[in-house]
């Protein structure tokens, strides 16, 4: 079994965007009550006393939108200050990043992923649900702030939706030519908006690779990250292009992560709901970190059987009960 050493931690299930593929505007959402979210202290306890003793060294803060969490800078500082932490990253939509980039960097964050599904303001606003006001410029300002502060690598995540932003693949890939940015194309998944998934389906990354290769050529990248992306590079480019192909290509045997939701549920597989365990309730019932650690160890041992490689969603109807923002992405 692959070494499991990477934990994705959702800080909050709320988001200031309503992206079509995640939190569509017409969806009714039951947000977690503030008192039911993991506290800063509980997150640190789990990281320090449960996950690090089990060999976890890499951590990523997600959401929802993690920058909406009032203590996000402090949580970054808490985890970054632990000597066992070898890598700490954060995924954001970038909208609030312009004002927070420097504070996050000073707190110890060095890697950041920013969602950018379009370079066209109108298309961007259509995807994120702009509610009558454009948000592209402020998001772009957040990306510029992250570069200015010194985040390296700076990664841009792109979810390609047929008929909406698929024509921009080459333009987004071109961002890597003059900048040391990493653009990652992520196949559209059936979590969050099953109706849109059924209507639009998804485009296999092999097709996108073919389009980029036809325009510039494409070399296999020399550097791999912590995740499942297959990395390539346009000849002579400063940055790289990654493809996360969770729908068309099975990468379960490379999976090295668990996911902790904002309300404390530990999930072994993004696309399979089997085997989740409630760590928050265990903590609040006074169960010791040592006993919780054993429960997590048992889940890790089962992870290879739970992974999505058999295309089992772990649901009775095939419909996921939690959205991407609730899971933590």
From Swiss-Prot:
Q: Which CDD domains match?
A: Radical_SAM (cd01335), Twitch_MoaA (cd21117)
* Residues reported in the UniProt entry to bind GTP: 8, 60, 91, 155, 257-259
Q: Which residues are involved in binding S-adenosyl-L-methionine?
A: 21, 64, 115, 189
Keywords in UniProt for this one?
4Fe-4S, GTP-binding, Iron, Iron-sulfur, Lyase, Metal-binding, Molybdenum cofactor biosynthesis, Nucleotide-binding, S-adenosyl-L-methionine
Summarize where [4Fe-4S] cluster 2 binds, as residue positions: 252, 255, 269
Ranges where the Radical SAM core domain occurs = 1-229
Q: Which PANTHER family match?
A: MOLYBDENUM COFACTOR BIOSYNTHESIS PROTEIN 1 (PTHR22960:SF0), MOLYBDOPTERIN COFACTOR SYNTHESIS PROTEIN A (PTHR22960)
Lineage, top-rank taxon, reads Bacteria
**Example GO molecular function term?**
4 iron, 4 sulfur cluster binding
UniProt record, GO biological process: Mo-molybdopterin cofactor biosynthetic process
- Stored InterPro entries: Aldolase_TIM, Elp3/MiaA/NifB-like_rSAM, MoaA, MoaA_NifB_PqqE_Fe-S-bd_CS, MoaA_twitch, MoCo_biosynth_MoaA/MoaC, rSAM
Which reactions appear under catalytic activity for this entry?
Answer: GTP + AH2 + S-adenosyl-L-methionine = (8S)-3',8-cyclo-7,8-dihydroguanosine 5'-triphosphate + 5'-deoxyadenosine + L-methionine + A + H(+)
Query: Which enzyme class, named as a word?
Result: lyase
Q: How does it assemble?
A: Monomer and homodimer.
Q: Could you say which residues bind [4Fe-4S] cluster 1 here?
A: 15, 19, 22
- SUPFAM superfamilies listed in its UniProt record: Radical SAM enzymes
Look up the record and name the pathway of this protein.
Answer: Cofactor biosynthesis; molybdopterin biosynthesis
Indicate what this protein is called per its UniProt record: GTP 3',8-cyclase
Per the record, the similarity remark reads: Belongs to the radical SAM superfamily. MoaA family.
Enzyme Commission no: 4.1.99.22
Cofactor: how and how many bound:
Binds 2 [4Fe-4S] clusters. Binds 1 [4Fe-4S] cluster coordinated with 3 cysteines and an exchangeable S-adenosyl-L-methionine and 1 [4Fe-4S] cluster coordinated with 3 cysteines and the GTP-derived substrate.
Q: Whose protein is this, by species?
A: Microcystis aeruginosa (strain NIES-843 / IAM M-2473)
- Cofactor(s) the protein needs: [4Fe-4S] cluster
